[in-house]
């Protein structure tokens, strides 16, 4: 099971079918991909604050091929564990990424990202799609 983070979504929306995301999708075309709803929120917020970027509904339709991973009670608890571990290791990451890591780790998915800081999260399998 693979879940994408915000960097993947932004790159998908801006690549125009060519680039690292397109290559990744071509290599994994038979696998379903999941998007944490928190990552979707981050992308939707970008639309609201960008000039001429369309609407949240338009963006949601462009991303409807992704399965959703909701933020649940179990993922909330997992995110607290992630934050505690990162703090103990002296490697904090931003709050929203802690929550995304909690969602993904709780369901046992791999996180598809180009953000290196997710590698600091114990027991979170990170798959890089771009360097």
Regions found by a protein language model. Give the residues of each.
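Short, well-structured N-terminal submotif of metal-dependent ribonuclease cores
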Residues: 1-35, 47-61
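Histidine- and aromatic-rich ligand-binding microenvironments
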Residues: 5, 35-36, 93-94, 115
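A generic structural signal for short hydrophobic patches within well-formed alpha-helices
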Residues: 9-10, 40-43, 76, 118-119
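Acidic catalytic patch
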Residues: 67-87
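Acidic, metal-associated active-site segment
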Residues: 94-110
